[in-house]
């Protein structure tokens, strides 16, 4: 459901007209699972999800309140069942708690029956025993807590009007339950934790290949957030699954996490990544070309990986990534005075000096993708929005007012790149020039 001002230039499809209805929907929100926001926050030392927070989309200055339930039920998005990988246990390919991993598969049809899109779910990381033990009690660490059905929206939609290039492909969402971007391979017996992300990746691919993916004429590996990072890490592995005759490419959405300096002068995300790498023994599964010259933690950062990925890769990212602002640039641990509290949740409340700091972050991101964008095989869509994950959201992927750069929307840019219909190296001007953004605003 959406709530919007009547004079808004953005006309949402669903509008709450009844105050009573709005209150009921807001109460229902606590019972609903999340769809879009894959962020994590630290609460009492544990990784919690932004699902706990009310969030808004702001389009062209208009605030739009959204709850997940009606967006799915009224728009009639397909609900796709969870498949547990029964052969995974014998391979040691299990979630943090030892439960079976899984995926959701919606079969393709017509001209797309032999094409495959595999989406890797995101959801942050756990960097300490305590965080990972907590994560075992959520869908991010155990299939026991995963939804039995989820809606397929955005790039996973089966409707040509919502997803023109991939709607009739076999579309898969691989669930994320290892806390290490599908890359770990270790365990902690004392805490009864299994860090088996790499094995989950292998088990999922083997299962999908057996279900017809090995006959794919075209394949796309995509993912959002921690799943977007996993795409970069696993892209060449995915490419090697197929013969040279298969068109294989990769799309990383909101996975370009920078090794950035935070507002206190420290490196909050580097500290988190160092914990993940150490705890999950990631160094054995990180790209060898990187660990031969850099330390393992550095090799978990995309900026040190993307130029060496051989398989065609598309980087889609918001230049003012909401997750990175909240958890890397201005986390509470780096802002004890709370001077960033308002800006962290709402870009419109940032001071001039805070915006200047964020502009420096954008400049660094732009500079880091310039070399990557030079080869014709690669694509870039770097929009100057306060957002995170734009492929699975109907409103940002291919809606009437979806974000665009030079009048080209995200879905069109990705399609042009994948099918080689035209150029797709799009880098936006700096904030506040882009009036097409669907910026995220949060309220605790």
UniProtKB/Swiss-Prot annotation:
Active site feature: 225, 321, 388
Sample GO molecular function, one term: hydrolase activity
One Gene Ontology cellular component annotation held by this UniProt entry: extracellular region
Glycan attachment points: 60
The keyword Transport is annotated on this UniProt entry: no
Enzyme nomenclature, EC number: 3.1.1.-
Family designation: Belongs to the pectinacetylesterase family.
Pfam families: PAE (PF03283)
Function: Hydrolyzes acetyl esters in homogalacturonan regions of pectin. In type I primary cell wall, galacturonic acid residues of pectin can be acetylated at the O-2 and O-3 positions. Decreasing the degree of acetylation of pectin gels in vitro alters their physical properties.
Keywords assigned by UniProt, alphabetized: Cell wall, Cell wall biogenesis/degradation, Glycoprotein, Hydrolase, Secreted, Signal
Source lineage: Eukaryota, Viridiplantae, Streptophyta, Embryophyta, Tracheophyta
Source taxon at top rank: Eukaryota
Range of residues in the leader sequence: 1-45
Keyword RNA-binding belongs to the record: no
BP terms from Gene Ontology: cell wall organization
Annotated compartments: Secreted, Cell wall
UniProt protein name: Pectin acetylesterase 2
Top EC class for this record: hydrolase
């Amino acid at each position: 459901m959406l709530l919007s001002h009547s004079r808004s230039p953005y006309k949402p499809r669903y509008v709450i007209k009844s105050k009573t209805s709005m209150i009921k929907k807001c109460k229902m929100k606590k019972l609903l699972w999340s769809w879009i926001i894959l962020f994590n926050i630290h609460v009492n030392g544990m990784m919690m999800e932004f699902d706990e927070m009310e969030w808004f989309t702001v389009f062209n200055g208009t605030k739009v309140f959204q709850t997940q339930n009606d967006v799915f039920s009224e728009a009639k998005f397909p609900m796709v069942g969870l498949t547990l990988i029964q052969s995974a246990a014998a391979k040691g390919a299990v979630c943090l708690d030892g439960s079976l991993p899984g995926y959701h598969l919606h079969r393709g049809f017509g001209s797309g029956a032999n094409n495959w899109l595999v989406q890797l779910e995101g959801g942050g990381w756990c960097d300490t025993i305590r965080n990972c033990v907590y994560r075992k009690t959520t869908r991010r660490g155990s299939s026991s807590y995963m939804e039995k059905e989820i809606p397929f929206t955005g790039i996973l939609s089966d409707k040509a009007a919502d997803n023109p290039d991939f709607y009739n492909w076999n579309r898969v969402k691989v669930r994320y339950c290892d806390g290490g971007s599908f890359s770990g391979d270790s365990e902690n017996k004392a805490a009864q934790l299994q860090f088996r992300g790499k094995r989950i990746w292998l088990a999922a691919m083997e299962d999908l290949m057996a279900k017809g993916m090995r006959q794919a004429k075209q394949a796309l590996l995509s993912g959002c957030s921690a799943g977007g990072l996993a795409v970069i890490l696993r892209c060449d592995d995915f490419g090697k699954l197929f013969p040279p005759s298969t068109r294989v490419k990769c799309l990383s959405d909101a996975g370009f996490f920078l090794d950035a300096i935070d507002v206190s002068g420290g490196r909050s995300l580097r500290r988190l990544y160092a914990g993940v790498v150490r705890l999950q023994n990631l160094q054995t599964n990180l790209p060898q070309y990187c660990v031969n010259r850099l330390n393992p933690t550095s090799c978990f950062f995309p900026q040190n990986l993307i130029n060496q990925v051989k398989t065609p890769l598309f980087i889609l990212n918001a230049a003012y990534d909401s997750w990175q602002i909240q958890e890397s640039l201005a986390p509470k641990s780096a802002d004890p005075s709370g001077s960033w509290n308002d800006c962290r949740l709402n870009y419109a409340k940032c001071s001039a000096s805070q915006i200047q700091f964020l502009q420096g972050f954008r400049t660094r991101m732009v500079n880091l993708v310039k070399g990557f964008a030079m080869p014709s095989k690669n694509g870039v869509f770097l929009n100057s929005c306060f957002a995170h994950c734009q492929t699975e959201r109907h409103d940002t992927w291919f809606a009437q007012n979806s974000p665009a750069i030079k009048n080209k929307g995200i879905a069109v840019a990705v399609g042009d790149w994948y099918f080689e219909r035209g150029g797709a190296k799009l880098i936006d001007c700096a904030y506040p020039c882009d009036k097409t953004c669907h910026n995220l605003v949060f309220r605790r």
